[in-house]
């Protein structure tokens, strides 16, 4: 759903969403007991997709940390209705050097998506016992999703992110 409200920075109010309500948000609600050494992929996007006739599309994909558990956060939303992306997703990409700029592919469970990054928020922390390596890329998602009843939904122009994280905490 579009996000609306007011963001106050240094005492100055900024309207979010505008008259068209075209600001989008994703809530990251994580909890639990995480292992000391963990890796994951995560990506999300939302907005109105022109190839989908202006329908509101949301995308939530992840990998690695849930492999082999039978559960995942993977889902595709169309006009507020959630369609589960069943099974594991396959991620094809590289964050070595400047290769993060190359398109990323995420497939599986009816999803065939491409992510084209335009910015990488790269962070590295190395405190010997505690380490964090994150490549959080922002860019544009496009592709298609096939629903359980066989409808193929093509989408494009969704601004979002995809990340690779490896933490030792």
Regions found by a protein language model. Name each.
Residues 1-169:
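Structured soluble/peripheral alpha/beta segments that form catalytic or ligand/cofactor-binding pockets
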């Amino acid at each position: 759903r579009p996000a609306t409200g007011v963001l106050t920075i240094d005492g100055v109010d900024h309207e979010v969403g505008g008259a068209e309500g075209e600001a989008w948000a994703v809530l990251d609600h994580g909890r639990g007991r995480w292992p000391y050494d963990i890796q994951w992929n995560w990506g999300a996007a939302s907005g109105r997709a022109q190839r989908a006739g202006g329908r509101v599309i949301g995308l939530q994909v992840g990998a690695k940390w849930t492999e082999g558990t039978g559960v995942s956060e993977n889902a595709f939303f169309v006009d507020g209705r959630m369609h589960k992306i069943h099974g594991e997703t396959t991620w094809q990409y590289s964050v070595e050097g400047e290769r993060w700029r190359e398109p990323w592919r995420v497939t599986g469970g009816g999803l065939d998506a491409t992510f084209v990054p335009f910015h990488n928020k790269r962070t590295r922390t190395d405190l010997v016992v505690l380490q964090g390596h994150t490549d959080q890329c922002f860019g544009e998602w496009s592709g298609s999703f096939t629903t359980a009843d066989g409808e193929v939904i093509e989408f494009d122009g969704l601004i979002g992110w995809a990340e690779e994280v490896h933490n030792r905490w």
